[in-house]
Regions:
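Residues forming the Rossmann-fold NAD(P)(H) cofactor-binding site
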Residues: 16-18, 95, 134
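Mid/C-terminal beta-alpha module of Rossmann-like enzyme folds, strongest
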Residues: 200-262, 275-309
Length: 309
């Protein structure tokens, strides 16, 4: 294979840590690009001496990004924010950031550009997150040899999904069901998403191809919580919060230092998060994802009795 260079933008997070370790295991040299790069010993157990570099760069800084990605044959964009903050807004992270990536990749004729988006962004017309993520997709599609990967909700040992609700359920007798908990998801294990990203690096697709990714199990939010409580052997009470009520509650929760949920996230829950067969990864790649029930069961063992994070 040789020492090919892959630049991973927004590589310091949950998905990035798994992806980068796998890329290192495969022998790539990886440039880890982030506003605030983080290096932890347990992040990259596959790393060899001098096999990766941590680079501080704001994705909106096109001039610096130009220099940083130069020499890369592949650029993977993982940038995404779930809260619209002044210092890191949806507009900056998603729209301006993707414009910057698009310009830099065009300038350097990058051989492969992989943009990680999210399922449902093309259907939800009220969430700022969805609207800006869709605009980001349109920017990246202007680059030759680009693909868009839209995963459903991603889970794994360090996630902010199962871990959040497992911790919440341990201390609260009540669990909220926004919109009655009827929003459907197709949860995908982080290691499966990583394998699909890696399988896409050297595969030829039409420019701007959309690939939707989800696990084999489709279940709604209430069913996910019922499964979680069963695994933790906890009895909790559900509170049904219609979307309009949840939005009002979120308005006040947004004023807390730690935001449990935002109004925009309530808007996102109005759209199901499942794969469209027309763009399913199974049309392009031969790969079987892990069952949510089996993988999540292993993950939740940490929370039983004296377990937990």
């Amino acid at each position: 294979m040789g020492q090919k260079i892959i630049s991973v933008i927004g590589g310091s997070g949950f998905i990035g840590s798994y992806l980068i370790d796998k890329l290192l295991e495969l022998g790539y040299y990886v440039k880890i690009i982030s506003r605030k790069p983080i290096a932890k010993k347990n992040f990259y157990p596959s790393a060899k001496l001098g096999q990766y570099s941590l680079i501080s760069c704001n994705v909106c800084d096109t001039k610096k990004l130009d220099k940083v990605i130069e020499g890369s044959f592949c650029v993977i964009n993982l940038v995404g924010v779930l809260e619209d903050k002044k210092k890191n807004s949806f507009n900056a992270a998603h729209i301006q950031g993707s414009e910057s990536i698009m310009k830099s990749c065009k300038k350097h004729n990058i051989q492969k550009v992989i943009h990680i988006s999210a399922l449902g962004v093309d259907k939800n017309k009220t969430s700022k997150y969805a609207i800006t993520k869709l605009k980001a997709e349109k920017n990246i599609k202007k680059v030759q040899n680009s693909i868009i990967i839209r995963p459903s909700i991603v889970f794994g040992y360090e996630d902010n999904f199962l871990n959040f609700f497992a911790n919440y359920a341990k201390f609260s007798p009540f669990l909220p069901l926004i919109g009655g908990g009827r929003t459907y998801f197709q949860p995908i294990l982080v290691s499966d998403l990583v394998q699909i990203i890696i399988a896409s690096i050297n595969k030829k697709f039409k420019d701007g191809q959309i690939i939707e990714v989800g696990g084999p199990d489709i279940l709604n939010f209430k069913e996910i919580l019922i499964f979680l409580l069963k695994e933790l052997k906890l009895k909790r009470y559900f509170i049904n919060l219609p979307f309009n009520v949840a939005s009002k509650v979120a308005f006040f929760l947004e004023r807390l230092p730690v935001k449990l949920i935002t109004r925009d996230q309530v808007e996102m829950l109005k759209t199901d998060n499942i794969v469209n067969k027309k763009n399913s990864y199974k049309k392009f790649l031969q790969y079987e994802c892990n069952s949510f029930f089996i993988a999540a069961k292993k993950q939740l063992k940490f929370y039983k009795k004296n377990g937990g994070h």
